[in-house]
From Swiss-Prot:
It is found in: Cell membrane. PANTHER family: ATP SYNTHASE DELTA CHAIN. F(1)F(0) ATP synthase produces ATP from ADP in the presence of a proton or sodium gradient. F-type ATPases consist of two structural domains, F(1) containing the extramembraneous catalytic core and F(0) containing the membrane proton channel, linked together by a central stalk and a peripheral stalk. During catalysis, ATP synthesis in the catalytic domain of F(1) is coupled via a rotary mechanism of the central stalk subunits to proton translocation. This protein is part of the stalk that links CF(0) to CF(1). It either transmits conformational changes from CF(0) to CF(1) or is implicated in proton conduction. F-type ATPases have 2 components, F(1) - the catalytic core - and F(0) - the membrane proton channel. F(1) has five subunits: alpha(3), beta(3), gamma(1), delta(1), epsilon(1). F(0) has three main subunits: a(1), b(2) and c(10-14). The alpha and beta chains form an alternating ring which encloses part of the gamma chain. F(1) is attached to F(0) by a central stalk formed by the gamma and epsilon chains, while a peripheral stalk is formed by the delta and b chains. GO terms for cellular component: plasma membrane; proton-transporting ATP synthase complex. Keywords: ATP synthesis, Cell membrane, CF(1), Hydrogen ion transport, Ion transport, Membrane, Transport. This is ATP synthase subunit delta. InterPro entries: ATPase_OSCP/d_CS (IPR020781), ATPase_OSCP/dsu (IPR000711). It holds the Pfam family OSCP. Belongs to the ATPase delta chain family. One of its GO terms (molecular function) is proton-transporting ATP synthase activity, rotational mechanism. It is a peripheral membrane protein. Its main location: membrane.
Length: 263
């Protein structure tokens, strides 16, 4: 049985051999929604204390007539994995939906464009506090929040970006922006690189951008995809977000440190 560490990679390999595009992704997302609604079913299919055959039989009974052969094969693969929790299973399947969308974008030669669009949608939401609240409001239906988002970006971005942006609204345990950031990290993994978000008081010159990429690649040992944010409040220097790592050399940060030291 595959360990938890290897489970995600195993599903990646199965997903990469099977369906691609938004239709396949939406099918996976629909399965995830069913599992999240039916907590007993989710526990049963992720219970590594049960025999693989029993879990396989449950998946057969619930999903065989409702999903495509490609999606069924992906679900079958989950029964050979060891899950730390029921939520780990649904997160892994959610990841496969995201990867399916991005694989479709790559086949259509829109991979980079979709990643850029996702980044800009995230920045759009981050820049509007009222929009952040509205998209995360549990008292509004998912459909209502998705409609609000579509009014802002519909017709301006690709089909792949629309599908992922709409899906990001569904999450109940993370903010919209956090979910989009997760999608961007998946995209960076698929491109065999890491994504760094750099915030500066004014736009970087070509020379500054090249030097920053060079230094980050030296530090991380990985190719870097740089996304830029201009924020005059940082005053000077740069704030770099690299996954869970933060490098803050901004003037605003140094001034704040000085104020704290002075009491």
């Amino acid at each position: 049985m595959t360990t938890a560490v290897g489970a995600s990679q195993q599903l990646d390999e199965v997903g990469d051999r099977r369906g691609t595009g938004t239709e396949f992704a939406n099918e996976i997302f629909a399965v995830v929604d069913v599992l999240n609604r039916e907590s007993g079913l989710r526990r049963a299919v992720s219970d590594t204390g049960s025999e693989t055959k029993a879990r396989q039989g449950l998946i057969d009974a619930v999903f065989t007539s409702k999903v495509s052969p490609d999606c069924k094969e992906l679900l079958d693969a989950t029964t050979t994995c060891k899950w730390r929790s029921p939520a780990a299973l649904t997160r892994a399947l959610e990841r496969q939906g995201v990867r399916a969308v991005l694989r479709g974008a790559r086949q259509a030669d829109r991979f980079e464009a979709v990643a850029d669009e996702l980044f800009h949608v995230s920045r759009l939401v981050r820049g509007q506090a009222a929009l952040q609240v509205a998209l995360g409001d549990p008292n509004r239906s998912v459909a209502d929040r998705q409609e609000l988002l579509m009014k802002l970006v519909g017709g301006q971005v690709s089909e792949e970006t629309l599908v992922l942006a709409r899906r990001a609204v569904v999450a109940s345990d993370s903010t919209f922006e956090q979910v989009i950031d997760g999608y961007l990290h998946v995209a960076a993994e698929m491109a065999d690189r890491r994504r760094a978000i750099v915030t500066t008081a004014k736009a970087l010159t070509d020379a500054q951008r090249a030097e920053m990429v060079k230094q980050l690649e030296r530090i991380t040992g990985s190719p870097i995809e740089l996304s830029e944010v201009v924020d005059p409040t940082v005053l000077g220097g740069a704030l770099i977000n690299l996954g869970d790592e933060v490098i803050d050399s901004t003037v605003a940060h140094r001034l704040d440190q000085a104020r704290r030291e002075l009491g």
